[in-house]
Each structure stands twice: as structure tokens, then as C-alpha cells.
Amino acid sequence: MNPAVRDTYGPADLSNNPVFAGGFINFGHWQAIDLDRPLDEADRIRSQQDLYRQVLRAAALPDEPEILEVGCGLGMGCALMLSECGRATVTGMDIHPEQLQRARDTHADLLRREPDRLRFVRGAAERMPVAGDGFDAVISVEAAQHFSDLRAFAEETSRVLRPGGRAAFASFFTVDGAPGRPGELAALLDTFANGLDIARPVQQLADALTGAGLAGVHVESIGRHVWPGWDRWLSRWWAPETWPRNFLRAYERGILDYYLVTAEQPR
């Protein structure tokens, strides 16, 4: 496991940081939230839920879907799926054992009530501990920036998707493969400097999905609905000159963007 991932999601427990109120640990999709008024915790939680909803809509789920979430964290998204996606069956997978224990503790009542609809398993995106052809959808929300090998992730996604199943991923990537991008981001953002986030172009993921045999690969920029709201929320704790505020600057300078990437397993 990447040491930065181990520490951030283990002893440091990023979910306890108030910038991630509600425990979803994503930057949020802010389109439906008025950014011209003071933001509160309810807005923040909704932004994170709405990012999941964008991904789930893009997954075009069938009735009673079986869904795998890669990088489930505390499982807040898994619980949202159970409440909003009909009779969904959800497997939440995460590489970090401490995160999985927190997920099981957080959702202990739900696991008792719905033992056949929700489970949490430990596994890496590049080597998923689940059977092939087992899922109608594979989703991932703001985790792919940590994955060490996008090609292996794509191959595993293809392996576990049923014919006609869909993949839907949301995360941030560089806008292109210019050789200077990693250095630019490391100079702006501590999470790239310390190796927690990996600077790669979104096209690398798209090509990996195509190479793994998936069809209809589509890349959509959703940064306009992510970065301004995220920066407004960060401004409650971080001054303009501090490094977290550089996410918006990296977007405005055309270095980094936030994407929704989808693909389908041919029938």
C-alpha cells in the first residue's frame, strides 16, 4: 500500500476532517447548491451525496442492480445506494483495513438489517477479490487518483462486469499528458508532492478501459460543478494563499480537472 494512502486513511483518518463533513470524503458536486450564500454542513453533505448521484445516473443501473464500489472508504456511498437505488445489492471494497473497520462500525445496524444486500471486503483496485461477471455496475468516486496502475484497474473492472454492465468513475486527472504536469501539481498541491495523489492524464484511464475491452468509453469534464464549490467550502478554514486553495488555481490554469468517465461491457 502507498505509504501516503496508509497514513492518510489510517492513523490520520481523513474522514474526521471537518472539510469532509458527513464522511463521504469527496470534493462534492455543487451544481444544485447556491454558492452566493454562506455554506453550512448540510450543503457540504449534499454536495458529496450529489457527486455519488451523478456517478450512479451515469451507471444507468438496471432494476435490482448488483454494484461494486472500488475505494468505498467509510461506506457512506454504499448506504446511499441502498436507500436510493431500489433493491440494489452493494459490495464496498477498500484497500485499507482501518477504513473497512470504520465502515463496518458505522453501518453495523444496516449490516444487521440487510445482510444480503451490503458487504464490505478488503481488496485493491488492481486485484479485486470478487468473482468475474458478478456486477451490473462498477463505480468509484474520488479514489482513482490513488490507484497505482490504471491499466490493471481497467482490466479488473472488465473482468468483474457482466455483459451489458457499466463502469462509472469520478475523479481528478491532469487535462493532458504534458511532461511537466506532475511537477506543476507537486509545486501547487501537497497531496501530489507527497504521493497521495498521482498526476496522470484522464486519457490514460480512457485508453486503459478501451484496451481492457470495454466499449463506448466517454470522458466528461464536470470541474465547473466541483472546483468553485470546493474552494468556497475550503475558504472556511484555509486562507487564499494556502496550498488547499490551489486546487481551484490548478483548474483555472488548465492543469487539473475533474472528470466523469464511463464505459460499458459489450453484450
Predicted regions and their residues:
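N-terminal auxiliary segments of SAM/dcSAM-dependent transferases
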Residues: 1-23
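Conserved alpha-helix/loop element of class I SAM-dependent methyltransferases that forms part
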Residues: 29, 46-63
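Class I SAM-dependent methyltransferase SAM/SAH-binding core
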Residues: 66-127
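A short acidic, Gly/Pro-enriched loop at the edge of an enzyme's catalytic core
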Residues: 126-138
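A short glycine-rich, Lys/Arg-flanked "PGG" loop and its adjoining helix->strand segment in the class I
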Residues: 151-166
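Short, glycine-/aromatic-enriched active-site segment of Class I SAM-dependent methyltransferases
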Residues: 173-195
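Short alpha-helix
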Residues: 197-213
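Conserved catalytic loop of SAM-dependent methyltransferase domains
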Residues: 215-240
